């Protein structure tokens, strides 16, 4: 999916693509070899690509970041710090880009990325322990860390237990 979206328009303009259960947000892959840990891609909306004469159809997820932030503020009104856990995968990178973009539009939020491109699970746990008061954790995706270690669902419980005072 990411490879298709990142192609030059002239190559794929007339090729119909049907997607199933993919995120509406995406990041376009870079042309060159870059250090992925330092890469700060911009989130793009697949609908915008469709409007550029891409032949796209299918089912997409829409992550409503603003609504999630509003819900957190309603449940935990004193929240000032929003930590986002994402892994070292395309899904993690694209979700982090989307959340950064959307949180940047909202005043009064300190965004703390807990990034699996730069950290393994043990570093993330230490960062969670050090979160300031009035923090919450947004759990994006956690499957692959900086060392290409693969994790199953129990890793998220380990992270949540690192700082039980922080809502996750």
Q: Where do the language-model regions lie?
A:
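Short hydrophobic alpha-helices and adjacent helix-cap/hinge residues
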Residues: 1-168
């Amino acid at each position: 999916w990411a490879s298709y979206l990142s192609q030059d328009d002239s190559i794929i303009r007339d090729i119909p693509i049907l997607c199933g259960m993919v995120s509406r947000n995406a990041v376009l892959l870079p042309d060159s070899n870059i250090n992925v840990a330092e890469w700060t891609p911009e989130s793009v909306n697949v609908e915008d690509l469709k409007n550029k004469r891409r032949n796209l159809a299918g089912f997409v997820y829409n992550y409503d970041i603003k609504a999630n932030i509003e819900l957190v503020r309603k449940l935990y009104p004193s929240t000032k710090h929003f930590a986002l856990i994402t892994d070292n995968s395309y899904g993690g990178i694209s979700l982090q880009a989307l959340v950064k973009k959307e949180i940047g539009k909202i005043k009064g939020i300190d965004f703390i990325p807990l990034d699996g491109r730069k950290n393994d699970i043990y570093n993330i746990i230490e960062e969670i322990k050090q979160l300031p008061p009035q923090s919450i954790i947004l759990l994006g995706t956690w499957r692959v860390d900086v060392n290409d270690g693969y994790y199953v669902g129990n890793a998220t419980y380990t992270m949540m237990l690192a700082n039980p005072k922080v809502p996750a």
